[in-house]
Structure formats: structure tokens, C-alpha cells
Regions:
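Non-globular targeting/processing and membrane-anchoring segments
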Residues: 1-97, 101, 121-122, 136-226
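Thiol-based oxidoreductase modules, predominantly thioredoxin-like and allied folds used
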Residues: 47, 96-115, 126-137
Length: 226
């Protein structure tokens, strides 16, 4: 940028080197993940979709042998779902058409299907497959729920091996430490990280979301030439 002094240029060069190193380290971690050995064979868990049962094995479509499941946190009898989970899924919805070109992808939750579907409709999740767990077995198997029914956000990957489905990878967010954990799955924090103030104490909320989506739908898209 014109006008930058030497101190800025030197600091920016150090940052550039660190950014390159970070990208390389991310790939090292991704390679370690890809090289995980075969996980255990899992039961053919049952879910509910539009009132009908569907099995885990039936979620593998076409020739795609990999399935990614995001498990949305829900507290029994609560009117709303986890705002952070909903934030992640807002982003997934926008790129679902791209994700499903390569892997199978669904959203699951312990919530009753009608409540889950209504929540998805209120958020504009029109590109995602939503499933309700049929009982606690699946959530507890992936550590998305403990024995007392306390939920935890979870993303889990399965791989179909002939007629068997195997567990491949599971991860949970770490929201107590500046939202690190599965934040790589959302652009929100990365945009904050580009700013001088960083992430600060920001925390996702469901408040105001309906008004925002109504405004966005009502406003035309303006294209600006640069």
C-alpha cells in the first residue's frame, strides 16, 4: 500500500512468512488426519426425516463413500437451538451445493424433526438435509451427548467400506478459549482475525437473526464494478 513506512513493511513481511508457515502446518495436520487408520465399524443408526425412518447407511448417495455429519446442539424443551451451532450451519448452507459434489453432508440433532425443520426454515437452511436422531444412541456414540443428556456440538466423518460404515474422525469446538476448535469450519472468526481488534469477546447469538434475514431477502443485490 502506498505510504507505508519501513516499520510497517518489515512487520508485514514477518507476518507474511508466519502466514505461509501456518498454511504449511495446516496441511501437515490435514495429512495426518487423512492418514488415520481404519476406524471401528459403527451400528446402522436410525434417524427420522419427514416422519420416515432413514438409516446411516442410506445417507451415502451415488458413488460418494464419505459422509460428514454436523450434530446441532439442542436442549430438551428449549425453544431455540445453539446459536454457535446455528452460525456454523448458516455458513454450511451457503456452500452446500459445493460440499455435496464431493461428500455426503447432513445436519442431525436430538430435537424432534418438526422442531428441527421449523428452526431450519427460520434460518433459511434450504440446501441442507436435516435429520432427527431416533433416540440417544447416535449422539452418545459420537460424544454429542453425555449420560445426563447434556449436549455438545460435534462434527463427525464416516466412511463406507463395502457394506460396512466405519467411523473416521470426530471433533468438537472449544468455546471457552476464544472460540478455537472447529473454527476452521467457519469464515466468521477468520474475518475477525484480519482486523486490528481481532475476535474480542464476540459470541454468536440468535437475537436479531430473523430481522436480518427478512431485510436481506427484501433488499436487491447490488453489483459494483471495481
Amino acid at each position: 500500500m502506498p505510504g507505508a513506512d519501513d516499520a510497517y513493511r518489515q512487520s508485514r513481511e514477518r507476518l507474511r512468512a508466519a502466514e505461509i508457515d501456518l498454511r504449511e502446518r495446516i496441511e501437515v495436520v490435514a495429512a495426518l488426519r487423512r492418514s488415520l487408520p481404519h476406524g471401528p465399524v459403527v451400528p446402522d443408526f436410525r434417524f427420522i426425516e419427514r416422519g420416515d425412518p432413514v438409516r446411516l447407511s442410506e445417507l451415502f448417495e451415488g458413488n460418494k463413500a464419505e459422509l460428514v455429519v454436523y450434530h446441532l446442539m439442542y436442549w430438551a424443551d428449549d425453544d431455540e437451538f445453539c446459536p454457535m451451532c446455528s452460525l456454523w450451519i448458516d455458513g454450511f448452507n451457503g456452500v452446500a451445493a459445493h460440499i455435496t459434489q464431493r461428500v455426503n453432508f447432513v445436519i442431525a440433532s436430538r430435537a424432534p424433526y418438526d422442531k428441527l425443520h421449523a428452526w431450519g426454515a427460520s434460518r433459511g437452511w434450504d440446501r441442507l438435509r436435516l435429520l432427527s436422531d431416533d433416540g440417544p444412541a447416535f449422539a452418545r456414540a459420537i460424544d454429542a451427548e453425555d449420560g445426563d443428556g447434556r449436549p455438545d456440538a460435534t462434527i463427525v466423518v464416516f466412511k463406507k467400506d463395502d457394506d460396512e460404515v466405519r467411523h473416521f474422525y470426530t471433533a468438537h469446538p472449544i468455546l471457552e478459549d476464544r472460540e478455537r476448535g472447529i473454527d476452521l469450519l467457519s469464515p466468521v472468526w477468520h474475518l475477525f482475525d484480519l482486523t486490528p481488534s481481532g475476535r474480542g469477546d464476540w459470541y454468536g447469538t440468535n437475537e436479531g437473526f430473523d430481522a436480518f434475514t427478512r431485510t436481506a431477502k427484501a433488499s436487491p443485490i447490488h453489483h459494483r464494478a471495481f
